[in-house]
Amino acid sequence: MVWSDPLAMPAFVDHVSIPVADFERSAAFYDAVLATLGLRRRKQREGAIGWGPDDVLPPIFWIHAREPGHATSGIGLHIGFRAKDRTEVHAFHEAALRMGATDAGAPGVRPQYTAGFYGCFVLDLDGFKIEALVREGLPPRD
């Protein structure tokens, strides 16, 4: 089945968790970056923090302290966070760079992905590619 409205798709992924090398530094990074999208810390336990919107539990995005033997950087992982509008995309990008991310694609239109796609890309402190995007022309994210 092809979904004409990606926002109407059922949620197939419950949550994502990534290992980080410097837990405290990454926690501060994601606090600042995810706040631009209206996400906040929803749960915390020793060595793990989860972020999400106020009305969603369990949290959808987690970091955890990397254990010895885990991959040491990005490993090709790419996570896209849905923004409400272009303003949130820009705020996400600016906050990420301010917190030490590496630019991997400034905010802009990318018609090669889908019509109405506007987004940005950064590499987080561990080299994971994270993105903020809005799909213009579709109903906005709540």
Predicted regions and their residues:
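Short beta->alpha transition motifs characteristic of CBS
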Residues: T114-A115, F121, A132-P139
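N-terminal beta-strand motif that seeds the catalytic metal site of vicinal oxygen chelate
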Residues: V2-A27, I79, E136-D142
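Exposed loop/turn and edge beta-strand positions of beta-sandwich/beta-sheet ligand-binding modules
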Residues: R45, I75, G116
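Short glycine-/small-residue motifs
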Residues: I60, E131-A132
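Vicinal oxygen chelate
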Residues: V20-R25, F81-L125
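Long, continuous compositionally biased terminal/linker segments
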Residues: W3-L7, G52-A91
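Core segments of cupin and vicinal oxygen chelate
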Residues: S17-I60
